[in-house]
Amino acid sequence: MDNKEFAKKLEFRTRQFGISIIKTSSLLPQTLEAKVIKNQITKSGTSIGANYREANRSRSQRDFKNKIKISESEASETEYWLEIIKDLNWIENEKLNPVIKET
């Protein structure tokens, strides 16, 4: 697999991850606290793919590295929110664990 093919596959995978985050966030309770986390996780979880896509369209190697670092940071933040959701038992583990694994 060459770099362009890898990049296309990872763009697709990160977009699918963003969709899974949106679906996961819709399972959260309708409390004020959960709405705050829903907003945070949706923003960080969908940002991973958006920044990766931008990295693939970067104008320089420096810009590429910067966008990749942002994607990594957003993935770390998303994992943090998923861990909080898990610790609070807001979503069943069989639904949450695959999303955590993909993060």
Regions found by a protein language model. Give the residues of each.
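Amphipathic alpha-helical assembly/interaction segments
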Residues: 1-103
